[in-house]
A protein has these predicted regions:
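Long amphipathic alpha-helical scaffold regions
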Residues: 1-262
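Acidic, Ser/Thr- and Gly/Pro-rich intrinsically disordered linkers and low-complexity segments
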Residues: 86-121, 190-196, 202-210, 244-275, ...
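Eukaryote-biased recognition of C-terminal alpha-helical segments
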Residues: 437, 563-598
Length: 598
């Protein structure tokens, strides 16, 4: 590696050589620690940078501290050539992804021993390139700037890593390109500061576009729509990567009496944790940006026009066919997240947002149906943030009393979609919120027979014991409500228990003959359901015998109580469970033993 003095001389004197020779010299000396300020001085020669600038993007971007040099390249290089190199570099970074950080760490250790310049991390490279795009895109004066803007945004989206810093750089980019500049906000502990050369740099240094043309009148609308679409895509990716937990927070807000005293809440965590505060701040900035871009409409026509149409997972994928604003769609997941944020921030922060004109039936049901599709588990796994957003929308609509505008209410289908989120969502807080909301929706169904059908479907056809247990709990709540309110419905007579008894208390006679390991697995899979079933049996036989069908006690004892008592007792003696597991097993045995069956 050459000495700094040697590199300084080479960079200064080499500019007199032909372009190819000088680029070769720069490639050799660019990694010398301390050389970049000298190179930036040389690049102030506009004629030189116009000739070689685009070739320097690849050379400089891996080097930490290259930002000033590349800003100069963006201001003085040929904008149409440099922007192509920037897009190529972003595409290359999109293929590297997160794994490159490990490579960079190894390179840093090796380079330290060779006294070379420190490599730049992938996120920092992306931020630098995004800053260059903001300058370049505004320098290009062409009849159809959307033909540069569209591919540039696709390149950024492909390389985008949803960190707060990269997202802030994206926000700065869109603000620069939209021409809308907000006054600086007061600094907060959750603020994120990244380089923004287009806003903070010297615009007077920008060289003119050597191929300038007058812009077509239609381009303003096209460019705005591209920025809207791009920003909704970024919003979707950000909330999918970072748990916003809107639905659990709304649940705590709407039902404060359900909060267990002394237990930490999600709301409190988002008020106090620095990382979570920053997370909220970034999403708030994205939403504010969309408002600046003209999206401030929560009408039925707007939301249904985006979210209730056939799925369009990549709205920026077909820019080669772009002819009009109508050819550019918004991200469906991003739009759902936007609506969820409007509802959440209105209720949680008293923010001034558009009021939703949607209803659960049919609007939100259609949104859920389109999102979950035929592969709900995969869809929720790929888009956990969107699933949380959809759940938050449902909670907000229900809280506002916006249930339906039609007599066609598919409570069972809607309830089914909620239970899918309750089962498949990776975050337990969101799963719990979905479960709670599913119970609320069930009890909201005005048709008692429809409510019973939903419960029967869950008990008979659902393969998830946790949901089977929920169905039993909801059934008990229906029975208690009918009794307390003096209502004469299907939950006030033995007919419902007669109809559901074999799903409530399935045949478990095989359990008595299972070996220890087999029953241990069986118990582990079904423990939640068995405990709830035993509790419900106690509720019936020791309190509401008027609902117990004739002859049910003997049948229940034979097929459910006796075999499970035998198997559970053997498991307890085998010491195959930990302390908490043993306590749950003992509770189950005691509950079965205390049933007043005879």
């Amino acid at each position: 590696m050459p000495e700094l003095s040697e590199s300084i001389a080479a960079v200064r004197e080499g500019a007199k050589e032909d372009t190819f020779t000088y680029l070769t010299i720069l490639q050799y000396h660019a990694n010398t620690p301390g050389i970049l300020p000298t190179l930036n001085e040389v690049l102030q020669d506009a004629d030189l940078t116009r000739e070689i600038g685009w070739d320097l993007v690849w050379t400089l971007i891996p080097i930490a501290g290259c930002e000033d040099c590349l800003e100069t390249v963006a201001r003085l290089g040929n904008p149409r050539e440099v922007i192509i190199k920037v897009m190529e570099a972003l595409n290359a970074l999109s293929r590297l992804g997160e794994s490159q950080d490990e490579i960079d760490d190894d390179e840093e250790e090796d380079d330290a021993s060779r006294s070379t310049a420190k490599p730049s991390s992938v996120p920092n490279r992306i931020i630098t390139l995004i800053g260059m795009l903001a300058i370049l895109q505004r320098r290009i004066k062409t009849k159809h700037p959307s033909r540069f803007l569209g591919p540039s945004l696709v390149s950024v989206l492909d390389a985008y890593q949803p960190t707060p810093e990269v997202t802030t750089a994206v926000i700065n980019l869109v603000r620069s390109l939209s021409g809308r500049r907000r006054p600086p906000l007061p600094q907060r502990t959750s603020s994120i500061d990244v380089a923004n050369p287009d806003e903070h740099g010297d615009i007077s240094k920008n060289a003119p576009d050597p191929e300038a043309e007058l812009e077509d009148d239609e381009e303003v609308n096209l460019n705005c729509r591209l920025l809207q679409s791009f920003t909704t895509c970024v919003l979707q990716r950000y909330v999918n990567e970072h748990e916003m937990q809107w639905s659990p927070r709304l649940l705590e807000l709407y039902y404060p009496d359900k909060i267990v005293p002394g237990r930490p809440t999600v709301t409190k965590a988002f008020r106090e944790d620095e990382v979570l505060l920053k997370r909220d701040a970034v999403v708030g900035q994205l939403v504010a940006l969309l408002r600046d871009l003209g999206i401030n409409d929560c009408s039925i026509s707007f939301v249904r026009g985006v979210v209730c149409q056939p799925s369009n997972t990549d709205p920026l994928a077909h820019l080669d066919k772009l002819n009009s604003v109508d050819d550019i769609s918004l991200s469906q997941g991003g739009t759902a997240s936007l609506v969820a944020y409007w509802i959440f921030s209105t209720d949680a922060f008293s923010s001034d947002n558009p009021n939703p004109e949607l209803h659960i039936f049919p609007d939100h049901l259609d949104m859920m149906k389109l999102f979950l599709g035929s592969e709900p588990k995969d869809e929720i796994s790929r888009n956990p943030g969107v699933a949380d957003a959809l759940l938050a929308i449902g909670l907000g609509l229900h809280h506002r009393g916006l249930l339906t505008t039609t007599d066609d209410r598919h409570y069972m289908m809607y309830h089914h979609y909620l239970t899918l989120i309750a089962v498949f969502h990776p975050n337990i807080q969101v799963r719990n919120a979905a479960t709670r909301f599913a119970g609320t929706i069930l009890h909201s169904d005005p048709d008692d027979e429809s409510r019973r059908d939903i419960l029967e479907d869950l008990l008979a056809n659902c393969s998830f014991p946790s949901l089977n247990a929920c169905a039993i709990s909801w059934l008990q709540e229906e029975i208690i409500t009918a009794h307390n309110d003096g209502i004469s419905n299907v939950f006030a007579s033995p007919e419902t228990i007669e109809r559901l008894q074999h799903d409530l208390f399935p045949d478990a006679r095989d359990a008595a003959t299972m070996d220890g390991d087999t029953f241990l697995d069986y118990w582990g899979e079904n423990q939640t359901f068995f405990l709830q079933a035993a509790s419900f049996a106690y509720f019936l036989f020791n309190g509401r015998k008027d609902l117990v069908p004739v002859g049910m006690g003997a049948s229940l004892e034979q097929r459910f109580v006796e075999p499970l008592t035998i198997a559970a007792t053997k498991l307890g003696k085998s010491k195959g469970l930990d302390g908490y597991g043993s306590m749950q097993l003992d509770l189950f045995i005691d509950r079965l033993a205390s049933l007043d069956i005879h």
